[in-house]
């Protein structure tokens, strides 16, 4: 009976995994079941080979790497990217505090608050968090800010504060963007990409390209 229960629990926890093969190395991500619309949309695009040959077109050191702009596939050097999309948006699936912007988190990009007050996600552009480590004082300030922005509905847990202090991330994004996955292998590749030299618009001088993305497992 115990074994059967364990097997059932394991099956419920199984997550879809995607391998992103890049010119800098491979990044393996697991998609959260708690964000089903984002998970299914991402898997659909991967299976359609949408991400193959696209660039990580926006890279900011100690912050994140962003890819998925369809205009980046054949973009000439020096062209500013980031406006390409698929013409639809995804309803927000913000599951904070369960999933948050720790180092390695995978989240969907979106338009700004003024034009997008419901925090709807872009259909295809995603980012992987690198971030930085924060001091206790930093986290106290960010906690006050989050509390104010959410009218007291959100706050950082002790575990999150510890993670941001010891491992790092981008806590200022919490509660405002949908985190739909996390890197489970290849953070050294993310680290290398986020260190790359960029132009004035955060595009890498030397293109970092997604060779292909493929689904590894499916629930």
Task: Describe each PLM feature range.
Residues 1-6:
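Bacterial N-terminal signal peptides
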Residues 9-219:
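Cyclophilin-like peptidyl-prolyl cis-trans isomerases
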């Amino acid at each position: 009976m115990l074994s059967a229960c364990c097997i059932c629990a394991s099956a419920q926890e199984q997550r879809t995994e995607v391998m992103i093969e890049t010119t800098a190395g491979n990044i393996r991500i697991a998609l959260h079941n708690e964000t089903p619309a984002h998970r299914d949309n991402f898997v659909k695009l991967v299976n359609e080979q949408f991400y193959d040959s696209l660039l990580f077109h926006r890279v900011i050191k100690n912050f994140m790497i962003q890819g998925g702009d369809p205009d980046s596939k054949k973009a000439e050097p020096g062209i500013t990217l980031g406006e390409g999309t698929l013409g639809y948006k995804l309803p927000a699936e913000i599951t904070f505090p369960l999933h948050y912007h720790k180092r390695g988190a995978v989240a969907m990009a979106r338009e700004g608050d003024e034009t997008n007050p419901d925090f709807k996600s872009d259909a295809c552009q995603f980012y992987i968090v690198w971030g930085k480590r924060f001091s206790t004082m930093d986290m106290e300030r960010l906690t006050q800010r989050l509390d104010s922005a959410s009218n007291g509905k959100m706050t950082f847990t002790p575990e999150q504060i510890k993670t941001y202090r010891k491992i790092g991330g981008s806590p200022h994004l919490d509660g405002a963007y949908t985190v739909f996955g996390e890197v489970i292998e290849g953070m050294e590749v993310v680290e290398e990409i986020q260190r790359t030299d960029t132009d004035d618009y955060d595009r890498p001088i030397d293109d970092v390209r997604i060779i292909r993305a493929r689904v590894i497992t499916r629930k």
